[in-house]
Amino acid sequence: MDYFNIKQNYYTGNFVQCLQEIEKFSKVTDNTLLFYKAKTLLALGQYQSQDPTSKLGKVLDLYVQFLDTKNIEELENLLKDKQNSPYELYLLATAQAILGDLDKSLETCVEGIDNDEAEGTTELLLLAIEVALLNNNVSTASTIFDNYTNAIEDTVSGDNEMILNLAESYIKFATNKETATSNFYYYEELSQTFPTWKTQLGLLNLHLQQRNIAEAQGIVELLLSDYYSVEQKENAVLYKPTFLANQITLALMQGLDTEDLTNQLVKLDHEHAFIKHHQEIDAKFDELVRKYDTSN
């Protein structure tokens, strides 16, 4: 089956269109359709149990339950038999990463990538790259990517090639490689071909990385326009925390006050990685001040 349009819309953040593509196969049942439908509904805040009779359906339900409770025990128990599909391991690894257990999450990803079942391994590879980069293991991310692509180079389908390109772009971004050439052109083309919040934010990050302040400001103003803020209001809500973090970064580069933007982000998502990172920096600074405060 051809999943290209489904995955294309999902990974460019066009979730409404992704659902429409999935509905074209309403008479077909398979794990890929179930996985992407559930993940898309979850992104839109519209999740409902899809197939509680199948193992993947049960795993999806327990994963959504975990997102609410942050209790991973039931999810782990269901998957302890080691006979799990890549999609099922994807959900477990994501839950482990959310809890901050990045090493264990990466182990789960690798277990699934080495699985004999091909369906879902490319998605799991992308997650492995994301987890490794979050854990500041750039060399690990590069090694996993190279090993995987070398092993399957003659059998890559179009829909999976798209995921591999995305994974490679993350590694290039993290290593600051080709930021003004191929990686930049990749995101520029995506944002022009699929003008969504996710693609524009990707391009915005590339401009911020290169300190292209005028171009970054242009994308901020574009995302504040009616086309994005009104006509794509579901995505506007979904990507608001990321957008605020980018706006704060840009404002700092411009020497502008960031208090209002920061307060908005804290109110919207006080656990956001940007906020936690700056809280850690502030804590270290305060510790240094106390250490060298000669008045004590």
Swiss-Prot record:
**Gene Ontology MF term list:** promoter-specific chromatin binding; structural molecule activity
Work out whether the entry's keyword set contains Cytoplasm: yes
Give me any GO biological process, just one: retrograde vesicle-mediated transport, Golgi to endoplasmic reticulum
Q: Per UniProt, which keywords does this protein have?
A: Cytoplasm, Cytoplasmic vesicle, ER-Golgi transport, Golgi apparatus, Membrane, Protein transport, Transport
One GO CC term of this entry?
A: COPI vesicle coat
How does the record classify its membrane topology? Peripheral membrane protein
Q: Where in the cell is it found?
A: Cytoplasm; Golgi apparatus membrane; Cytoplasmic vesicle, COPI-coated vesicle membrane
Q: What does this protein do?
A: The coatomer is a cytosolic protein complex that binds to dilysine motifs and reversibly associates with Golgi non-clathrin-coated vesicles, which further mediate biosynthetic protein transport from the ER, via the Golgi up to the trans Golgi network. The coatomer complex is required for budding from Golgi membranes, and is essential for the retrograde Golgi-to-ER transport of dilysine-tagged proteins.
Task: Print the miscellaneous field.
Answer: Present with 23100 molecules/cell in log phase SD medium.
Q: Which PANTHER family match?
A: COATOMER SUBUNIT EPSILON
Family per record: Belongs to the COPE family.
Query: How is this protein organized at the quaternary level?
Result: Oligomeric complex that consists of at least the alpha, beta, beta', gamma, delta, epsilon and zeta subunits. Interacts with the ESCRT-0 subunit VPS27.
- Which protein, by its recorded name, is this? Coatomer subunit epsilon
Species of the source: Saccharomyces cerevisiae (strain ATCC 204508 / S288c) (Baker's yeast)
